[in-house]
UniProtKB/Swiss-Prot annotation:
Claim: Glycosyltransferase is one of the keywords in the record: yes
Family assignment from sequence similarity: Belongs to the thymidine/pyrimidine-nucleoside phosphorylase family.
Disulfide bonds: none
Pathway(s) of this molecule: Pyrimidine metabolism; dTMP biosynthesis via salvage pathway; dTMP from thymine: step 1/2
Keyword Transferase carried by entry: yes
UniProt cross-references to PROSITE patterns, sorted A to Z: THYMID_PHOSPHORYLASE
Keywords: Glycosyltransferase, Transferase
Organism of origin: Escherichia coli O127:H6 (strain E2348/69 / EPEC)
Pfam families the UniProt entry points to: Glycos_trans_3N, Glycos_transf_3, PYNP_C
EC number: 2.4.2.4
Quaternary context: Homodimer.
NCBIfam families linked: PRK05820.1, T_phosphoryl, Y_phosphoryl
Entry protein name: Thymidine phosphorylase
């Protein structure tokens, strides 16, 4: 038996906590026997004193074990359980292609996703722009879809890592969100509750990233890889670029449209293709569905070329109560904005810099995201045909096409786009889409 205040005191004085002490505290968070003040105090001591790797692993596993941990053994699946998690960005629609692509190659992807947070778009919000799409199937249905289709993308239920929800709510109001051990545990508790064999992390870098600097993004990626492997799940991470909008579009319905076009081969943005393929390659290698990069790429290209990946996406949409002919007739089903009009730069030049975060906030301001949890989303608004770094823009080539609900909203968005995109006399040097791979 432990006392919460003694655990806080021990950490306050700079000592490492035992696995038993950490589990006692986390179970107390779940059971409401530990107060908000005590949660805040421990969070602040961790913020200042950090945690050792064994402490980080214990914290993550205790948070994972505070709720249901999915077990797939009874389904006798003939492939690995694998997933990807992204720290979030703008135009980051990779999940919608990646899940079906990896499933078409023999993996099983029980993806538990989130809503939009701040300037970043949420996978669930994007999927809910599809009429009827059910992000909360019951447990039996979720398992059925995984067995039959190979991939399902659903929302987090209250039974998964419940201690994290309470811990995070306290961190949010006590300036302790940006602590690497606490971020790591929060991300991984939910992901590891999926019962995974392998996990790939997409940690964003740049003006639209969650972490403000390359060094902090790198530190987070290294922490996640170390902790997840310590918890028994094969995990690698990629540091990927978020100095510009990843896809050609940013919003909800507009990104779903681009995801379908990507899967069918109608249009594939080169940077989006690079990042999606790189993440899929990691997933296939980590889960032993491919022995090396070349084999993984060949398999992935094949399921794009032969239509299998698009077919899996269509089956997932239908299984989650969306239209059965969505892939063929997406334009008929996705909502369209009242006003669609291009915005042009005031001068000619090359796109040299992009405030990706500001562009994400512009989508939120148009109604495409939430400022508070109770807000309703306008799924039709957003940007398409986004200019990329190095593009030459003039009276013919716009900065973006804005999809808005009315003229006022369009004007505000146009102002935001012009302010977020800087031009120069010559094109900047190109930046990589993937900066670094991190493995154990």
């Amino acid at each position: 038996m432990f006392l919460a205040q003694e655990i806080i005191r021990k950490k306050r004085d700079g000592h490492a906590l035992s696995d038993e002490e950490i589990r006692f505290f986390i179970n107390g968070i779940r059971d409401n026997t530990i107060s908000e003040g005590q949660i805040a105090a421990l969070a602040m001591t961790i913020f200042f004193h950090d945690m050792t790797m064994p402490e980080r692993v214990s914290l993550t596993m205790a948070m994972r074990d505070s709720g249901t941990v999915l077990d797939w053994k009874s389904l006798h699946l003939n492939g690995p359980i694998v997933d990807k998690h992204s720290t979030g960005g703008v135009g980051d629609v990779t999940s919608l292609m990646l899940g079906p692509m990896v499933a078409a190659c023999g993996g099983y992807i029980p993806m538990i996703s989130g809503r939009g947070l701040g300037h970043t778009g949420g996978t669930l919000d994007k999927l809910e722009s599809i009429p009827g799409f059910d992000i909360f199937p019951d447990d039996n249905r979720f398992r059925e879809i995984i067995k039959d289709v190979g991939v399902a993308i659903i929302g987090q239920t209250s039974s998964l890592a419940p201690a994290d929800k309470r811990f995070y709510a306290t961190r949010d109001i006590t300036a302790t969100v940006d602590s690497i051990p606490l971020i790591t545990a929060s991300i991984l508790a939910k992901k590891l509750a999926e019962g995974l064999d392998a996990l790939v992390m997409d940690v964003k870098v740049g003006s639209g990233a969650f972490m403000p600097t390359y060094e902090l993004s790198e530190a987070l990626a290294e922490a996640i890889v170390g902790v997840a492997n310590g918890a028994g799940v094969r995990t690698t991470a990629l540091l990927t670029d978020m100095n510009q909008v990843l896809a050609s579009s940013a919003g909800n319905a507009v990104e779903v449209r681009e995801a379908v076009q990507f899967l069918t081969g109608e249009y594939r943005n080169p940077r989006l293709f690079d990042v999606t393929m790189a993440l899929c390659v990691e997933m296939l290698i980590s889960s032993k569905l491919a022995k090396d990069d070349a084999e993984a790429r060949a398999k992935l290209q094949a399921v794009l070329d032969n239509g299998k990946a698009a077919e899996v996406f269509g089956r997932m949409v239908a299984a989650q109560k969306g239209p059965t002919d969505f892939v063929e007739n997406y334009a008929k089903y996705l909502p369209t904005a009242m006003l669609t009009k291009a915005v042009y730069a005031d001068t000619e030049g090359f796109v040299s810099e992009m405030d990706t975060r500001a562009l994400g906030m512009a989508v939120v301001a148009m109604g495409g995201g939430r400022r508070q949890a109770s807000d309703t989303i306008d799924y039709s608004v957003g940007f398409t045909d986004m200019a990329r770094l190095g593009d030459q823009v003039d009276g013919q080539r716009p900065l973006a096409v804005i999809h808005a609900k009315d003229e006022n909203s369009w004007q505000e968005a146009a102002k935001a786009v012009k302010a977020a995109i800087k031009l120069a006399d010559k094109a900047p040097e190109s930046t990589p889409t993937v900066y670094r791979r991190i493995s154990e």
